[in-house]
Amino acid sequence: MELTQNEILEVNLVGKEESITIDTDDQVEEIVKALSSNTRRKILRQIQIEPADVSKIASDLEMTEANISAQIKKLEKAGLITCEYSSGAHGVRKISRLRYDELLIKF
């Protein structure tokens, strides 16, 4: 049985520093769509271990940087990750990290 966003009443995102409840259809849909991609779930697992930049994630997952960058934008738009810029050996790096530790879905 496939789960659709219309069947979800509420999503709770729980983190060390903040917790929020999502109950609007548009926001729930954004999160469900972000989690529907196997590639995006792999990225979440990767940065759960350690925050990383696009090139590290792409290398570890054996995917192109362009693809990873596009997927990170979708995860960031859904509010599941945060990104910050840091100086690196070859310029500025965009470091991605999980924003929350848990996602609870209520029906």
Name each model-derived stretch.
Residues 41-45:
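Pre-recognition alpha-helix immediately N-terminal to the DNA-recognition helix
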Residues 33-40:
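Short helix-coil-helix linker/hinge
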